[in-house]
Amino acid sequence: TWAHGNSGDFAPTYYLQTDAPLYYYSFTDAYIARAFQKLKPAQQARLDPMITGFNPADMYAADHIRRVLETFPGVFTGIGEFTIHKEFVSSKVAGDTASLTDPALDRILEFAGEVGLVVILHNDIDMPFAKAGAEPVYLTQMKDLLRRHPRTTIIWAHTGLGRVVHPVQPQAGAEVAERSPNHIEILQTMLDDPTLAHVSFDISWDEVAKYAVSSPAAIDRLSQLLNAYPDRFLFGTDNVAPNDQATQMRVYDLWNPIWAKLTPEASRKVRLGTYERLFDAARGNVRAWEVANVK
């Protein structure tokens, strides 16, 4: 919202630039679709537009997604990134608060599974400034949600991290450490869980990179995890409307200490292969659904 009483003549373009409420701008889906349709086929083939203009706390959200597909067949591959719990954002959204237990979210994920849409979901694993030694507040609810939708391809954005939602670290002492695994152990447990085989993780955002390369030990832990499960991770920059390629490469280069420790096969899968596999499959599934359902 551009609230003149809050920011005056300054027009905010990012959620941190204003204290005014945020709202879901549904026209974004039509705007993206029209822009995509103006591209040449060779350009379209390089893009996977995503539906984002829905309120995940609204029981009509799944209907909105269906209408977008019916109105613009041949365009969209998935939904997201959309947000449930996010530091500095959730409290600013006008209307009902989104929740991992809201049936509106279940309707969204159920419909995505029916169509074959890939889902990118941002949900902080914990509250900001959480105390060490405690289980992340939203971890159990998140896993329960993921298990309720085994037919839906879901990507947990940023592995649940944020600007101040940092990786879980156990307190000193074996007893506490045993009760509270660190972030890498949480991810590994989820990766080994057969009920979560449909879930992948993206390592996009420079805020995630700062945790990944924060120390030699952190670099070693994450690179070992990526080498062991390269089919479950996707790299991305998470840049918002970058002006040039250098802006994109700045985030990519932050990961150089990690890239240096990956096997060639794992490196390619994390940087490109996992994305191609998930999104190419989703694109084919969505097009098939549109042929069968859009009249």
What kind of feature is each model-predicted range?
Residues A62, S91-V93, A132-G133, H166-P170, ...:
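Short aromatic-enriched loop/helix-cap "lid" or pocket-rim segments at secondary-structure transitions
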